[in-house]
């Protein structure tokens, strides 16, 4: 599962996920991409589940790039613990996703196979996505 090797601080503020993605919004590595239309958080488990679904479908052909990385820690307090006594411990890591962000890219397979693989991956994700094709010259 993806998570930072080490961080400067263990805990982060919750923050607000606003705006649209301008960086990481184009197909840069492969021929096809899965782009987020909705906004939300992707956990490292969701990223891995979608990657497995795609990898299983394309079998041995093609190459997949993961364009997002979960670098934000989410803390939780244990069950049945009274309020107060400080912030809970980091339990998992998430990637904050804005609309327009490229999530995955794929190359070395034909379009119909890529579409189906991304459809299977999108079912594992908590936000709306769309299939995009890299246009030559961009």
UniProtKB/Swiss-Prot annotation:
InterPro entries named in the record: Ribosomal_uL16 (IPR047873), Ribosomal_uL16_bact-type (IPR000114), Ribosomal_uL16_CS (IPR020798), Ribosomal_uL16_dom (IPR016180), Ribosomal_uL16_sf (IPR036920)
Entry GO terms, CC: cytosolic large ribosomal subunit
Source superkingdom: Bacteria
Subunit structure: Part of the 50S ribosomal subunit.
Function: Binds 23S rRNA and is also seen to make contacts with the A and possibly P site tRNAs.
Alphabetized NCBIfam families for the sequence: rplP_bact
Official protein name in the record: Large ribosomal subunit protein uL16
Gene designation: rplP
